[in-house]
Amino acid sequence: MRDWHIHLERGSYTVEWAEQFVRRAEKLEISEICLLEHSVRFFEFHPTFAQARAYNDYQQHWFDEKVQTARHLDEFKRFGDALRAKNYPVKIKLGLEICFFPQHADVIEQVTRDGYFDLLLGSVHWIDNWTFNQRKNQWQGRDVNALYRRYFELQNQAADSGLFDILAHPDLIRCFGFTPDFDLTEQYKTLCQKVKAQGMLLEMNGAKGPGLHPDFLAVAKACGVQFS
């Protein structure tokens, strides 16, 4: 068994902190883990958040708080080098969960082109620069059908970009229980076909979220998609 979505953000870049995850994985009989950081944690990715920051006061405050604890990627890589020099009973991969903004795909490519990380997870947390998964009340008065359509369009673009190994929590749009009044089978099918064509994996992620809808899962399996 493997867990490729473990965030480090509550601790420091030390071997001792990472070894806590190793010990926990051993207890759970997990043979492989991937230690991740969100892209907003690094200055190199901050240009991708420019329009999102400017979207409203809440998002400006959210981003400015993240800046206070931001680091440079080289720090994470030095931490990764230290881990790769060790020999653990649990295999450790290193990765990034990258917020996908289609207008900044070039920045993402430039920052990650050195191939240092084992896994790059692409995630859609923002619909045209609006963060849909942080506050339920911000959904009020919005066109749920339009948001769902746009969400899947953005995921299609993330898959087509060729930037990522895994599409992270691809059903996150359901986080607050709002659902469209139309059938999503075609959206599921189109996305799964693109994921399959790119050789990507689709993430099964139920942490603080709804996980994949059964219909989404069925379509993914029918398309021959592989999961992480």
What name fits each language-model region?
Residues 14-24, 103-111, 150-158:
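Short, acidic/polar
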Residues 1-102, 174-194:
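An N-terminally biased module of ancient metal coordination in phosphate/nucleic-acid-related enzymes
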Residues 45-46, 103-108, 131-134:
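Short, conserved acidic/polar surface loops in the N-terminal third of protein domains
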Residues 52-60, 216-228:
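Short, structured secondary-structure boundary patches
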Residues 47-51, 109, 136, 217-220:
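Short low-complexity, flexible loop/linker segments enriched in glycine and/or proline
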Residues 87-91, 116, 225:
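A short helix-to-beta-strand connector/capping loop
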Residues 98, 115-117, 122-224:
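Domain-core and long-helix interface of multi-subunit machines
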